[in-house]
């Protein structure tokens, strides 16, 4: 599992469509489908119940979405904190006798 897979999965959930998620993220539809398929394979679950007109989360998908969304928020928070720390670095001088 990697962050791109989580991002693609969450986008598909939020957009309600793999096609719309692909457009939102500026990637191809097969990239989104493949990422979701890899997640399903890795965890041996079905994340979506596919119907002709709508993409619906399965029970496993709902639980996974909550955690995936939380993980992506945590990663974004960590990035912002590291960025803030990077801007406030002070040089350290070390003297060796």
Walk through the language-model features, giving the residues of each.
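The N-cap/first-turn positions of alpha helices
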Residues: 2-5, 29, 61
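Short alpha-helical "packing" element that flanks the helix-turn-helix/winged-helix DNA-binding module
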Residues: 8-12, 64
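Short helix-boundary/capping micro-motifs
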Residues: 12-26
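Helix-turn-helix DNA-binding elements, focusing on the entry/boundary residues of the two helices
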Residues: 17-18, 36, 50
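A short LG(V/I)-centered, amphipathic sequence patch enriched
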Residues: 40-57, 76-79
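Alpha-helical linker/hinge and terminal dimerization helices associated
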Residues: 42-43, 64-86
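Interdomain hinge and pocket-entrance segments immediately C-terminal to HTH DNA-binding domains
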Residues: 83-97
């Amino acid at each position: 599992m990697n962050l791109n897979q989580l991002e693609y999965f969450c986008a598909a959930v939020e957009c309600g469509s793999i096609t719309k998620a692909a457009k939102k993220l500026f990637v191809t539809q097969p990239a989104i489908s493949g990422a979701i398929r890899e997640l399903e394979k890795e965890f041996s679950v079905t994340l979506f119940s596919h119907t002709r007109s709508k993409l619906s989360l399965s029970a496993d998908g709902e639980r996974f979405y909550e955690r995936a969304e939380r993980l992506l928020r945590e990663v974004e928070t960590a990035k912002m904190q590291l960025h803030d720390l990077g801007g406030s670095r002070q040089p350290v001088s070390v003297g060796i006798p």
